[in-house]
Regions:
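Short coil turns that delineate tetratricopeptide repeat
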Residues: 64-65, 98, 129-132, 165-166, ...
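Residue-level recognition of tetratricopeptide repeat
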Residues: 75, 109, 142, 176, ...
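Helix-start (N-cap) detector for alpha-helical repeat units in TPR-like alpha-solenoids
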Residues: 67-68, 101-102, 134, 168-169, ...
Length: 505
């Protein structure tokens, strides 16, 4: 299981950096974006060159040895993706030392409660007045990412890595962060560096396997997970990760077996129990899938996990053709998300309801509500808000283009373009490309549409439109390759299923 990038339990799309920026951040590469964007491992032009420390590790500033012990225990739990347990350790550390900047920073980084994250960010900023320069850079990296200010975040990350080039944990964090931005090759380079420094770094073994899986190199990923299981033989997460990657590779029976092995190690391991539901759903056994989701729900510790499980439960009805029941279930989950004031989930559920709407008018109404939810007061980060708004606008452009409402589609594309210029977030940039590709296709500009759609490779709807245009252009080889890729998509979101089922018939 991955904490930042979950192949199955992820209805909020990944946050990416613009392609040019991603290319520019590879270590020791020449800057490709602009003079304002340093290459990863180089310093920001606006900052003094950071001193290179001979110490391998970033210091941990705290007045309490007990707080430091708890913080480090939390780190190790987090490397094995036991996020709830890690957060509990970090919260306890802040009680021992209320001015523990790194503990507050990690709560910001991995917290699931938006209100807690907002409070932790404020505490971290106050506590950072008395910490080392490296710790201040770590905080800046995290806070700027959380606010959706990616260029500033990269600059801070660059400077921090330049200060501590032999810190395996920072290389690991950089790799995981790049993975969350969709730069899997760059992520793999940093994760491999962490493993060169510490060959038994369990979290890095797991993360590298996911890097490879995201590049569809499943056979190369599996040995790292087997090594991970050797390093952590009593932990369920290595088996859970192996099950998830086998699922993504379409090896569903093997995936079921590995989820069961994980549950033997920890019968209360929520992610593996939910994973069983996902695989049975992919196998077409929706009754059994719902039974497994029902078992998983009481195991969920965080409200977001409960909502994830309930959403998957609802989607199972759509998979068996009972769209009315799926809508009813999603409406029920929406009530719960609203009660918990989880605006990102409210927005996503409206997106799902738009996909299942009885009419285009109803679909657009749900997209209106998805946008309106994001404007409501909440503790949602700027990054999360931009991600959800970008997805809503892309869906609006796609549906409007299909309906021939080119004015509405153009307005959505224009809005996305303004967001790209303001945020430099790649989730926005890719959504803009996908939306513009749909609009250009509707305007009978297939060549331009093809180039745009290629820039949105993780969106199933964009890839389906790409395959259609490639076929119409008599580009049989490319069309076949795109269709094969879609057919091999074993993602578990509603959109994955709605699109991919057409390519498996």
């Amino acid at each position: 299981m991955q904490i930042l990038l979950r192949l199955r339990r992820h209805h909020c799309r990944r946050a990416f950096l613009p392609r040019a920026v991603v290319a520019a951040v590879l270590l020791y590469s020449a800057p490709l974006y602009s003079a304002a964007m340093p290459a990863l491992g180089q310093t920001s032009p606006s900052s003094a060159s950071p001193a290179i420390h001979t110490d391998d590790r970033l210091p941990i500033t705290t007045s309490s040895p007990e707080a430091q012990r708890l913080f480090e225990e939390g780190l190790h739990l987090r490397y094995d993706y036991h996020t709830d347990a890690a957060l509990a350790k970090w919260r306890e550390a802040t009680m021992k030392d209320p001015n523990f900047a790194q503990a507050w920073t990690y709560i910001v980084w991995f917290g699931l409660n938006p209100a807690e994250v907002r409070m932790a960010a404020e505490k971290a900023q106050i506590a950072s007045r008395n910490v080392t320069p490296g710790e201040k850079l770590l905080l800046k990296w995290v806070l700027q990412t959380n606010d959706g200010r990616f260029l500033s975040a990269i600059a801070a990350m660059n400077d921090l890595l330049a200060m501590y080039p032999r810190d395996a944990h920072l290389s690991y964090e950089a790799g995981l962060w790049l993975q969350s931005q969709g730069d899997y090759e760059g992520a793999a380079k940093f994760t491999k560096r962490a493993l060169e420094i510490d060959t038994n770094f369990a979290g890095a073994l797991n993360t590298l396997a996911y890097d490879l899986a995201f590049m569809h190199q499943y056979d190369a990923a599996i040995p790292y997970l087997k090594r991970y299981a050797e390093v952590e033989p009593t932990d369920p997460n290595p088996r859970d990760s192996l099950a998830e990657i086998l699922q993504q590779a379409g090896r569903l029976d093997e995936s079921l077996a590995e989820y069961r092995e994980a549950l033997k190690l920890d019968p209360r391991f929520y992610h593996s129990q939910e994973g069983l539901g996902d695989v049975y759903s992919l196998l077409g056994n929706q009754d059994r899938a719902r039974q497994e989701y029902a078992k998983a729900l009481p195991m969920a510790q965080a409200p977001t996990e409960k909502l994830d499980c309930q959403i998957q439960f609802a989607i199972s009805y759509a998979r068996e053709g009972n769209v009315k029941q799926a809508r009813a279930q999603l409406e029920s989950v929406l009530v719960q998300a609203t009660k918990w004031k989880l605006n990102a989930y409210q927005s996503s559920i409206h997106q799902y309801l738009a996909l299942l709407a009885e009419s285009r008018a109803a679909a657009f109404e749900h997209l209106d509500q998805s946008e309106a939810t994001l404007k409501m007061p909440s503790h949602m980060s700027g990054k999360a808000r931009d991600r959800q708004l970008a997805r809503t606008l892309e869906m609006r452009a796609q549906l409007a283009a299909e309906a021939g409402n080119l004015a509405m589609a153009q307005a959505a594309v224009d809005h996305l373009q303004r967001m790209v210029q303001a945020s430099r977030s790649n989730v926005v940039e890719r959504a803009w490309h996908g939306a513009n590709g749909a609009l250009l296709a509707a305007q009978a500009k297939p060549s331009a549409a093809l180039e745009e759609l290629k820039q949105d490779p993780d969106n199933a709807s964009s890839m389906a439109k790409l395959a259609e245009l490639q076929g119409a252009a008599a580009n049989a080889l490319d069309a076949a390759e795109t269709r094969t890729r879609l057919k091999a998509d074993y993602g578990t979101t509603l959109e994955d299923w709605l699109v991919v089922r057409e390519f498996r018939q």
